[in-house]
Amino acid sequence: MVYDATYFHKDGCLLNLMNAQDQKIIAHIYVQKESFKDAYPWFMSLKYQGLNPRFITTDGEQSIMRAMKQVWPQARLQRCLYHLQREGMRWLRTYPKTEAGRKLRALLSKLSRIKTVGERDTFIGDYAAWISQYRDFIRFLPQTTVANKDLKRTMVLINNALPDMFYYLDDERVPATTNALEGFHSRLKADYRRHRGLSKEHRIQYINWYCYFENKTI
């Protein structure tokens, strides 16, 4: 299945789970914010109802992954390649000032296009070579500039995510990205904008009905 969240104004967030095969919404909940406190009891209630996924593709929000691991310890968490690529390239900026940053950005630009085990192995090999060449350089970079901090931050991001990047290559039913659910949220928000001014209670009712009726046509 696929997990994603989207905010509505400042007073609420929609948490959503989608079936990766038929792209229908499995369950959703409107909460104050995307957090362990709100997600954990929701996940537990779904588990009690019989939901036990083998794989969950997620955007990488740490508090949500912690809740998922506690509720479904057997589930593999596939990191969304698009989110990883976008986040890393945003931190590296369009024109990195260091050679290490430029090479890492070039490597990251290939991530979401990996379709085969061979391409995966090439990516991992190239990243291992990059780490070997630049790890000490990054370790001793002055941490007085945001750009230097963000270069190290990107390296840590990839290091932490790497074990969970490529489950989709072993099982074609596992999505590599959360794009399908993000597309659902985009359509929801586009429709919602035609109903601006709803109270929070009516907004939740609107979202509930939208998810219900959209499931009839997806």
Language-model segments: residues:
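RNase H-like nuclease fold core
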Residues: 1-62, 66-74, 180
